[in-house]
């Protein structure tokens, strides 16, 4: 055991050094000042001991070790202290840490701990106004307590707005919502209940959707129940449900959910047809565009693998995504549609349009290079040699990107000597992920 202990300490120190590097990179994106440098070997040893004490739930012992060390060690130990739900960190400790360490990782967890401590200490009256001035409640209890405080202090519109936001976002529980309505005698309208049901169903939280049924009028009860049943794997009369839907967005969501159900049941072609029908009915809600695209992406690739290239292209190109609804989903959709058009359908003109869309929305060197390279391939396939070379040159202007390096190999006279041109590994034709 004695022989093993130095190795264990060395491994622990190595892991902690990695943690320090991660935090330093997040906190100091540029070179830090001397006072902000990483711990020395001696300080790292103290940090290892303090972390070991925390791991053993000896929070007081860890603090005692850290108090004798420079600020960087004290801060790292305190970071773990305020992040843990079992450390006994006080609200003042958490609040002070957040104020002094704005860019540290794990901030969301620390804020959650702060709210829990605020409520546990019954500090809403004295500390709530400052705490919630710069952040929204994260818990149901926090939503309720802060709304009640605002309502009691003649901030009724602010209280109602907060309750509405928490309710639709699924932060406020049904029990706490009922507590609010009993206290304030101000129930939310049915449109907010419907919005909450929509959020619950997009998050695949069927129980949360079902508990709202009693708060809705009969026609909307039927719609929410139908969609919940579909997500539970139960067959429903889709036409009747769509007829009762209050908006085109709800119609599209019902059809989309049925497409997912059919896919899970192994009815692939029926699923493709329904997904395309959903596309024709309404665009996806911006908040759930990524989920919408994930299903389209899966189905398009499944269709492509089955040799149904035309269907695959339709699923990728007709998803009705925009750069404003979800930039990540939009970029993925445009690339996949362009790739299928070029490689599988031999329609470079269509492909060029998608790669141009990709280029127009690109926000990073990697995406710019990718868009320019594939646009160049589409132009080359169309016989537009000069324009293709211009596009390859644009991609090569991003030499750190994979497609920038590939583009060098497509240029007859690259802007650097051949021996200096960076080499790409892998094949572009395989990269459709």
What spans do the regions from the language model cover?
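Bacterial N-terminal signal peptides
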Residues: 15-27
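N-terminal secretory signal peptides that target proteins for export/translocation
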Residues: 1-11
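Signal peptide processing junction and immediate N-terminal pro/mature segment
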Residues: 27-36
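Alpha-helical solenoid repeat scaffolds
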Residues: 35-433
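Compositionally biased, low-complexity repeat tracts
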Residues: 9, 13-14, 30, 229, ...
């Amino acid at each position: 055991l004695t022989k093993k202990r130095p190795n264990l300490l060395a491994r622990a120190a190595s892991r902690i050094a990695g943690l320090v590097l991660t935090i330093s990179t997040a906190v100091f994106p540029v070179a830090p000042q001397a006072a902000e440098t990483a711990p020395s070997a001696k300080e790292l040893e103290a940090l290892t001991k303090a972390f070991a004490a925390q791991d053993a739930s000896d929070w007081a012992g860890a603090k005692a070790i850290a108090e004798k060390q420079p600020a960087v060690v004290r801060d790292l130990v305190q970071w773990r202290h305020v992040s843990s739900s079992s450390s006994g960190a006080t609200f003042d400790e958490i609040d002070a840490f957040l104020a002094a360490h704005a860019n540290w990782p794990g901030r969301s967890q620390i804020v959650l701990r702060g709210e829990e401590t605020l409520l546990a200490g019954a500090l809403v009256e004295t500390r709530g106004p400052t705490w919630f001035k710069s952040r929204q409640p994260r818990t149901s209890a926090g939503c309720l307590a802060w709304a009640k405080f605002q309502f009691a202090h003649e901030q009724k519109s602010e209280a109602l707005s907060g309750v509405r936001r928490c309710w639709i976002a699924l932060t406020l529980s049904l029990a706490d919502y009922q507590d609010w309505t009993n206290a304030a005698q101000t129930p939310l309208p049915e449109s907010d209940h419907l919005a909450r049901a929509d959020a619950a169903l997009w998050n695949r939280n069927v129980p949360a959707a079902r508990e709202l049924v009693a708060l809705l009028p009969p026609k909307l009860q039927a719609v929410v129940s139908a969609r919940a049943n579909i997500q539970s794997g139960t067959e429903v009369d889709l036409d009747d449900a769509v007829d009762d839907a209050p908006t085109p967005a709800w119609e599209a969501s019902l059809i989309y959910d049925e497409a997912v159900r059919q896919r899970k049941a192994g009815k692939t072609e029926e699923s493709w047809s329904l997904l395309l029908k959903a596309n024709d009915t309404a665009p996806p809600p911006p908040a759930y565009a990524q989920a919408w695209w994930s299903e389209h992406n899966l189905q398009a690739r499944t269709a492509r693998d089955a040799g149904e290239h035309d269907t695959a292209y339709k699923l990728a190109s007709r998803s009705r995504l925009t750069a404003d609804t979800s930039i990540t989903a939009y970029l993925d959709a445009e690339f996949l549609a362009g790739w299928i058009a070029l490689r599988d359908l031999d329609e470079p003109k269509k492909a060029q349009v998608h790669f141009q869309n990709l280029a127009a929305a690109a926000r990073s060197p990697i995406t710019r290079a990718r868009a320019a390279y594939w646009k160049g391939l589409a132009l080359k396939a169309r016989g537009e040699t000069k324009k293709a070379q211009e596009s390859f040159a644009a991609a090569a202007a991003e030499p750190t990107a994979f497609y920038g390096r590939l583009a060098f190999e497509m240029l007859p006279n690259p802007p650097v000597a051949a021996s200096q041109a960076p080499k790409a590994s892998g094949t572009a034709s395989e990269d459709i992920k």
